Protein backbone atom coordinates (compact mmCIF):
# COMPACT_ATOMS: atom_id res chain seq x y z
CA UNK A 1 0.00 0.00 0.00
CA UNK A 2 1.26 3.47 -0.92
CA UNK A 3 0.54 5.22 2.38
CA UNK A 4 1.62 8.65 1.17
CA UNK A 5 -0.99 8.51 -1.59
CA UNK A 6 -3.62 7.04 0.77
CA UNK A 7 -3.09 9.82 3.34
CA UNK A 8 -3.14 12.49 0.63
CA UNK A 9 -6.47 11.19 -0.73
CA UNK A 10 -8.11 10.78 2.69
CA UNK A 11 -6.95 14.20 3.92
CA UNK A 12 -8.39 15.82 0.77
CA UNK A 13 -11.63 13.81 1.12
CA UNK A 14 -12.11 14.72 4.82
CA UNK A 15 -11.21 18.39 4.22
CA UNK A 16 -13.67 18.71 1.31
CA UNK A 17 -16.44 16.85 3.14
CA UNK A 18 -16.20 18.83 6.38
CA UNK A 19 -15.56 22.19 4.70
CA UNK A 20 -16.14 25.04 7.16
CA UNK A 21 -18.04 22.80 9.58
CA UNK A 22 -16.68 21.06 12.66
CA UNK A 23 -16.29 17.33 13.23
CA UNK A 24 -16.11 15.14 16.31
CA UNK A 25 -14.26 11.87 16.49
CA UNK A 26 -15.00 8.91 18.70
CA UNK A 27 -11.65 8.40 20.41
CA UNK A 28 -10.96 5.31 22.50
CA UNK A 29 -7.16 5.23 22.54
CA UNK A 30 -7.07 2.03 20.50
CA UNK A 31 -5.14 1.91 17.23
CA UNK A 32 -8.22 2.34 14.98
CA UNK A 33 -9.69 5.47 16.53
CA UNK A 34 -6.23 6.95 17.22
CA UNK A 35 -5.22 6.55 13.57
CA UNK A 36 -8.51 8.01 12.36
CA UNK A 37 -8.03 10.94 14.78
CA UNK A 38 -4.51 11.78 13.56
CA UNK A 39 -5.65 11.48 9.92
CA UNK A 40 -8.61 13.80 10.56
CA UNK A 41 -6.46 16.23 12.59
CA UNK A 42 -4.07 16.40 9.62
CA UNK A 43 -7.02 17.30 7.40
CA UNK A 44 -9.00 19.80 9.47
CA UNK A 45 -6.84 20.75 12.47
CA UNK A 46 -8.74 22.53 15.25
CA UNK A 47 -12.08 21.96 13.52
CA UNK A 48 -11.70 18.42 14.88
CA UNK A 49 -12.96 17.78 18.41
CA UNK A 50 -11.93 14.43 19.89
CA UNK A 51 -14.56 12.94 22.19
CA UNK A 52 -13.39 10.41 24.75
CA UNK A 53 -16.20 8.70 26.63
CA UNK A 54 -15.39 6.95 29.88
CA UNK A 55 -18.00 4.19 29.73
CA UNK A 56 -16.79 2.48 32.88
CA UNK A 57 -15.78 -0.49 30.71
CA UNK A 58 -12.22 0.56 29.95
CA UNK A 59 -8.90 -1.12 30.67
CA UNK A 60 -6.94 -0.26 33.80
CA UNK A 61 -5.36 3.19 33.42
CA UNK A 62 -7.00 3.79 30.02
CA UNK A 63 -8.68 7.17 30.72
CA UNK A 64 -5.44 8.69 32.06
CA UNK A 65 -3.45 7.25 29.13
CA UNK A 66 -5.80 8.71 26.51
CA UNK A 67 -5.94 12.18 28.07
CA UNK A 68 -2.15 12.32 28.45
CA UNK A 69 -1.48 11.10 24.89
CA UNK A 70 -3.98 13.16 22.90
CA UNK A 71 -4.46 16.31 24.97
CA UNK A 72 -0.92 16.70 26.32
CA UNK A 73 1.23 15.12 23.60
CA UNK A 74 -0.79 15.72 20.40
CA UNK A 75 -2.44 18.97 21.51
CA UNK A 76 -5.90 18.00 20.23
CA UNK A 77 -9.21 19.47 21.39
CA UNK A 78 -10.18 16.64 23.73
CA UNK A 79 -13.60 16.45 25.37
CA UNK A 80 -13.57 14.00 28.29
CA UNK A 81 -17.05 12.70 29.14
CA UNK A 82 -17.57 10.63 32.29
CA UNK A 83 -20.67 8.61 31.41
CA UNK A 84 -20.08 5.58 33.62
CA UNK A 85 -23.36 5.82 35.56
CA UNK A 86 -25.31 6.27 32.35
CA UNK A 87 -23.91 3.11 30.76
CA UNK A 88 -24.36 0.96 33.87
CA UNK A 89 -27.97 2.17 34.22
CA UNK A 90 -28.74 1.42 30.56
CA UNK A 91 -27.39 -2.13 30.92
CA UNK A 92 -29.16 -2.96 34.19
CA UNK A 93 -30.84 -6.36 33.92
CA UNK A 94 -29.61 -6.95 30.33
CA UNK A 95 -27.99 -10.35 29.72
CA UNK A 96 -28.24 -10.87 25.95
CA UNK A 97 -24.86 -10.08 24.32
CA UNK A 98 -26.37 -8.64 21.13
CA UNK A 99 -28.68 -6.40 23.14
CA UNK A 100 -25.72 -5.26 25.28
CA UNK A 101 -23.75 -4.24 22.18
CA UNK A 102 -26.71 -2.34 20.70
CA UNK A 103 -27.47 -0.49 23.95
CA UNK A 104 -23.81 0.52 24.30
CA UNK A 105 -23.83 1.74 20.69
CA UNK A 106 -27.00 3.74 21.28
CA UNK A 107 -25.70 5.42 24.45
CA UNK A 108 -22.39 6.18 22.69
CA UNK A 109 -24.22 7.99 19.90
CA UNK A 110 -26.44 9.90 22.36
CA UNK A 111 -23.33 11.16 24.16
CA UNK A 112 -21.65 12.14 20.88
CA UNK A 113 -24.74 13.99 19.69
CA UNK A 114 -24.90 15.99 22.93
CA UNK A 115 -21.24 17.05 22.62
CA UNK A 116 -21.73 17.73 18.90
CA UNK A 117 -24.62 20.09 19.68
CA UNK A 118 -22.51 21.92 22.26
CA UNK A 119 -19.69 22.56 19.81
CA UNK A 120 -21.84 22.80 16.68
CA UNK A 121 -20.35 19.78 14.90
CA UNK A 122 -22.09 18.27 11.91
CA UNK A 123 -19.81 15.30 11.27
CA UNK A 124 -18.90 12.21 13.27
CA UNK A 125 -15.63 10.53 12.30
CA UNK A 126 -15.21 6.90 13.35
CA UNK A 127 -12.36 4.41 13.25
CA UNK A 128 -14.52 1.64 11.75
CA UNK A 129 -12.37 -0.94 9.92
CA UNK A 130 -13.26 -3.69 7.43
CA UNK A 131 -13.78 -6.61 9.88
CA UNK A 132 -16.28 -4.47 11.87
CA UNK A 133 -18.77 -4.03 9.05
CA UNK A 134 -18.07 -7.44 7.48
CA UNK A 135 -19.05 -9.17 10.75
CA UNK A 136 -22.04 -6.87 11.21
CA UNK A 137 -23.21 -7.42 7.63
CA UNK A 138 -22.76 -11.17 7.99
CA UNK A 139 -24.92 -11.06 11.16
CA UNK A 140 -22.12 -12.61 13.24
CA UNK A 141 -22.30 -9.85 15.86
CA UNK A 142 -23.03 -6.13 15.99
CA UNK A 143 -20.06 -3.84 16.40
CA UNK A 144 -20.94 -0.87 18.57
CA UNK A 145 -19.75 1.57 15.90
CA UNK A 146 -21.91 0.07 13.14
CA UNK A 147 -24.69 -2.22 14.40
CA UNK A 148 -25.48 0.05 17.32
CA UNK A 149 -26.08 3.12 15.18
CA UNK A 150 -29.70 4.28 15.31
CA UNK A 151 -31.56 4.53 12.01
CA UNK A 152 -31.86 8.28 12.33
CA UNK A 153 -28.37 9.59 12.94
CA UNK A 154 -28.23 13.32 13.54
CA UNK A 155 -24.58 13.46 12.53
CA UNK A 156 -23.14 12.73 9.09
CA UNK A 157 -20.72 9.83 9.30
CA UNK A 158 -17.14 9.74 7.96
CA UNK A 159 -15.24 6.43 8.14
CA UNK A 160 -11.78 6.94 6.57
CA UNK A 161 -10.44 3.48 7.53
CA UNK A 162 -13.44 1.36 6.57
CA UNK A 163 -11.62 -0.57 3.81
CA UNK A 164 -8.51 -1.37 5.87
CA UNK A 165 -7.67 -4.43 7.95
CA UNK A 166 -5.96 -4.25 11.34
CA UNK A 167 -2.44 -4.98 10.06
CA UNK A 168 -2.85 -2.17 7.49
CA UNK A 169 -4.11 0.23 10.17
CA UNK A 170 -0.97 -0.50 12.22
CA UNK A 171 1.22 0.27 9.18
CA UNK A 172 -0.68 3.51 8.55
CA UNK A 173 -0.40 4.51 12.23
CA UNK A 174 3.36 4.01 12.07
CA UNK A 175 3.52 6.04 8.84
CA UNK A 176 1.56 8.87 10.51
CA UNK A 177 4.07 8.98 13.36
CA UNK A 178 1.95 7.56 16.16
CA UNK A 179 3.99 6.14 19.05
CA UNK A 180 4.62 2.39 19.17
CA UNK A 181 2.66 2.15 22.43
CA UNK A 182 -0.44 2.90 20.33
CA UNK A 183 0.17 1.17 16.99
CA UNK A 184 1.30 -2.05 18.65
CA UNK A 185 -1.54 -2.17 21.18
CA UNK A 186 -3.70 -5.25 21.22
CA UNK A 187 -7.19 -4.74 19.78
CA UNK A 188 -9.84 -3.92 22.38
CA UNK A 189 -13.58 -4.25 21.67
CA UNK A 190 -15.60 -1.04 21.30
CA UNK A 191 -18.05 -2.08 24.05
CA UNK A 192 -15.00 -2.75 26.22
CA UNK A 193 -15.07 -4.97 29.27
CA UNK A 194 -18.89 -5.13 29.07
CA UNK A 195 -18.52 -7.96 26.54
CA UNK A 196 -15.96 -9.69 28.76
CA UNK A 197 -18.57 -10.16 31.47
CA UNK A 198 -21.00 -12.93 30.58
CA UNK A 199 -24.52 -11.94 31.60
CA UNK A 200 -25.53 -8.76 33.41
CA UNK A 201 -22.89 -6.05 33.74
CA UNK A 202 -22.33 -4.51 37.18
CA UNK A 203 -19.57 -2.23 38.54
CA UNK A 204 -18.37 -5.08 40.78
CA UNK A 205 -18.06 -7.57 37.89
CA UNK A 206 -16.26 -4.98 35.76
CA UNK A 207 -13.80 -4.34 38.61
CA UNK A 208 -12.98 -8.08 38.77
CA UNK A 209 -12.53 -8.52 35.01
CA UNK A 210 -10.50 -5.29 34.73
CA UNK A 211 -7.99 -6.57 37.30
CA UNK A 212 -7.84 -10.02 35.66
CA UNK A 213 -7.39 -8.46 32.23
CA UNK A 214 -4.49 -6.31 33.47
CA UNK A 215 -2.77 -9.39 34.95
CA UNK A 216 -3.10 -11.31 31.66
CA UNK A 217 -1.67 -8.39 29.65
CA UNK A 218 1.20 -7.87 32.11
CA UNK A 219 2.24 -11.54 32.17
CA UNK A 220 2.03 -11.90 28.39
CA UNK A 221 4.24 -8.85 27.96
CA UNK A 222 6.64 -10.06 30.67
CA UNK A 223 7.01 -13.40 28.85
CA UNK A 224 7.87 -11.58 25.60
CA UNK A 225 4.86 -13.04 23.76
CA UNK A 226 3.30 -11.08 20.88
CA UNK A 227 -0.26 -12.38 20.49
CA UNK A 228 -3.02 -10.68 18.51
CA UNK A 229 -5.09 -10.46 21.69
CA UNK A 230 -4.75 -11.59 25.29
CA UNK A 231 -7.51 -11.00 27.82
CA UNK A 232 -9.69 -12.33 30.63
CA UNK A 233 -13.42 -13.06 30.69
CA UNK A 234 -15.64 -13.31 33.77
CA UNK A 235 -17.82 -16.33 33.03
CA UNK A 236 -20.50 -15.70 35.65
CA UNK A 237 -20.13 -19.29 36.86
CA UNK A 238 -19.13 -20.06 40.44
CA UNK A 239 -17.27 -23.26 41.28
CA UNK A 240 -16.21 -25.00 44.47
CA UNK A 241 -12.65 -24.59 45.73
CA UNK A 242 -10.58 -24.84 48.88
CA UNK A 243 -9.28 -21.94 50.94
CA UNK A 244 -7.16 -23.11 53.86
CA UNK A 245 -9.27 -25.97 55.20
CA UNK A 246 -12.54 -24.34 54.26
CA UNK A 247 -14.78 -24.91 51.23
CA UNK A 248 -14.93 -21.83 48.97
CA UNK A 249 -17.44 -20.98 46.24
CA UNK A 250 -15.97 -18.42 43.85
CA UNK A 251 -16.04 -16.88 40.37
CA UNK A 252 -14.40 -18.41 37.29
CA UNK A 253 -12.16 -16.50 34.86
CA UNK A 254 -11.42 -17.70 31.32
CA UNK A 255 -8.15 -16.57 29.71
CA UNK A 256 -8.04 -16.12 25.93
CA UNK A 257 -4.75 -15.61 24.05
CA UNK A 258 -4.88 -15.79 20.25
CA UNK A 259 -2.66 -15.32 17.21
CA UNK A 260 -4.05 -13.71 14.05
CA UNK A 261 -3.11 -11.49 11.13
CA UNK A 262 -6.33 -9.54 10.64
CA UNK A 263 -8.83 -10.75 13.24
CA UNK A 264 -10.97 -12.53 10.64
CA UNK A 265 -9.56 -15.93 11.68
CA UNK A 266 -7.49 -16.72 14.78
CA UNK A 267 -5.70 -19.60 16.50
CA UNK A 268 -5.45 -20.18 20.23
CA UNK A 269 -1.83 -19.53 21.15
CA UNK A 270 0.37 -22.34 22.43
CA UNK A 271 1.39 -20.45 25.56
CA UNK A 272 4.20 -21.86 27.72
CA UNK A 273 2.75 -23.73 30.70
CA UNK A 274 4.67 -21.65 33.27
CA UNK A 275 3.14 -18.44 31.85
CA UNK A 276 -0.39 -19.85 32.21
CA UNK A 277 0.41 -21.04 35.74
CA UNK A 278 1.71 -17.60 36.69
CA UNK A 279 -1.45 -15.96 35.29
CA UNK A 280 -3.67 -18.40 37.23
CA UNK A 281 -1.68 -17.93 40.44
CA UNK A 282 -1.79 -14.14 40.25
CA UNK A 283 -5.50 -13.94 39.39
CA UNK A 284 -6.54 -16.27 42.24
CA UNK A 285 -4.12 -14.59 44.69
CA UNK A 286 -4.77 -10.96 43.82
CA UNK A 287 -8.52 -11.11 43.15
CA UNK A 288 -10.20 -12.69 46.21
CA UNK A 289 -13.51 -13.24 44.38
CA UNK A 290 -11.92 -15.63 41.82
CA UNK A 291 -11.25 -19.29 42.63
CA UNK A 292 -10.66 -20.89 39.23
CA UNK A 293 -8.91 -19.94 35.97
CA UNK A 294 -9.46 -21.70 32.62
CA UNK A 295 -7.58 -21.38 29.31
CA UNK A 296 -9.65 -21.24 26.10
CA UNK A 297 -8.08 -23.36 23.33
CA UNK A 298 -10.78 -22.75 20.67
CA UNK A 299 -9.83 -21.28 17.29
CA UNK A 300 -11.85 -18.77 15.22
CA UNK A 301 -13.86 -20.26 13.59
CA UNK A 302 -15.82 -21.92 15.20
CA UNK A 303 -15.58 -19.39 18.07
CA UNK A 304 -15.26 -15.62 17.74
CA UNK A 305 -12.27 -14.03 19.52
CA UNK A 306 -14.40 -12.26 22.13
CA UNK A 307 -16.90 -14.35 24.11
CA UNK A 308 -19.80 -11.96 23.42
From Swiss-Prot:
Complexes and interactors: Heterodimer composed of a glutamine amidotransferase subunit (A) and a GMP-binding subunit (B).
Gene: guaAB
InterPro entries reported for this sequence: GMP_synth_C, GMP_synthase_B, GMPS_ATP_PPase_dom, NAD/GMP_synthase, Rossmann-like_a/b/a_fold
Catalytic activity as recorded in UniProt: XMP + L-glutamine + ATP + H2O = GMP + L-glutamate + AMP + diphosphate + 2 H(+)
Metabolic or biological pathway: Purine metabolism; GMP biosynthesis; GMP from XMP (L-Gln route): step 1/1
Role: Catalyzes the synthesis of GMP from XMP.
Protein name per UniProt: GMP synthase [glutamine-hydrolyzing] subunit B
Residues where ATP binds: 28-34
GMPS ATP-PPase domain segment(s): 1-185
Keyword entries, A-Z: ATP-binding, GMP biosynthesis, Ligase, Nucleotide-binding, Purine biosynthesis
Keyword Isomerase: no
UniProt-listed Enzyme Commission number(s): 6.3.5.2
PROSITE patterns: GMPS_ATP_PPASE
Lineage: Archaea, Methanobacteriati, Methanobacteriota, Thermococci, Thermococcales
Amino acid sequence: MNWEKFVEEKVKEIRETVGDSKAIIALSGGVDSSTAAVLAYKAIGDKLHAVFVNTGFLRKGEPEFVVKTFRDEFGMNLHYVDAQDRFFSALKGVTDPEEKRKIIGRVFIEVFEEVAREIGAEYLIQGTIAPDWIESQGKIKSHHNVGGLPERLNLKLIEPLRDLYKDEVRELAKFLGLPEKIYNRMPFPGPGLAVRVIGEVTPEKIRIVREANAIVEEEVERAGLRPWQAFAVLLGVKTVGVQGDIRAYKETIAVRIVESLDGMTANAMNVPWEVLQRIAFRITSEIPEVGRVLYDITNKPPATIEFE
